[in-house]
């Protein structure tokens, strides 16, 4: 029970291979207000809270995100965020709704900016998300002519000169609101970089 009067069955990913279930897709109806995922907050204000996001939440967000970053079927998007971080939905499902190619970044190159830059160039990556401090460093080191949008989020973005060849976005939003609610394109050097305005569909 979730305290909302609704009951949900949960399964852990480790248990999936032990299930004796058919491999065909079940014929079920999915409604906009059906539960899509439960994510836990960081617990910065106390005990982590489970946030129940519905199908309409993630679809509404992805329609905004793909528009902001210009993601389409020709795009090459990275899966950089860890699976338990809500930003991983932004990456994965932006590719699903747009038909973009999704590149899962290997653990061994995630903090190796030389290797990461080479990967971005070799695979013509167009869109990526990174946590703020990692993205701050990578934005200064990236030499890929293919990158169009780098979104950073998770903490305050330090002052930075805007990249010349791609757009740098500072995103903010609580887990409860499905990844980010506000976004700001860094277009000039500022001592205090704002979180910007609310995205469409908030």
Stretch-by-stretch model annotation:
Residues 24-202:
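Motif- and composition-driven signal specific to adenylation
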């Amino acid at each position: 029970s979730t305290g909302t009067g609704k009951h949900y069955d949960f399964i852990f990913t480790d248990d999936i291979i032990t299930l004796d279930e058919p491999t065909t897709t079940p014929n079920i109806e999915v409604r906009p207000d059906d539960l899509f995922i439960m994510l836990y907050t960081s617990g910065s204000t106390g005990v982590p809270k489970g946030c129940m996001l519905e199908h309409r939440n993630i679809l509404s967000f992805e329609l905004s995100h793909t528009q902001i970053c210009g993601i389409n079927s020709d795009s090459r998007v990275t899966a950089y965020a860890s699976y338990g971080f809500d930003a991983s939905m932004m990456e994965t499902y932006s590719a699903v709704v747009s038909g973009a190619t999704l590149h899962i970044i290997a653990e061994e190159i995630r903090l190796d900016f030389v290797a990461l830059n080479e990967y971005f160039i070799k695979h013509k990556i167009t869109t990526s998300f990174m946590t703020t401090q990692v993205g701050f460093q990578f934005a200064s080191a990236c030499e890929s002519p293919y990158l169009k949008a780098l979104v950073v989020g998770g903490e305050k973005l330090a002052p930075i000169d805007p990249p010349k060849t791609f757009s740098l976005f500072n995103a903010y939003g609580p887990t409860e609101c499905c990844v980010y609610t506000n976004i700001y394109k860094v277009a000039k050097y500022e001592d205090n970089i704002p979180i910007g305005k609310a995205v469409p569909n908030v």
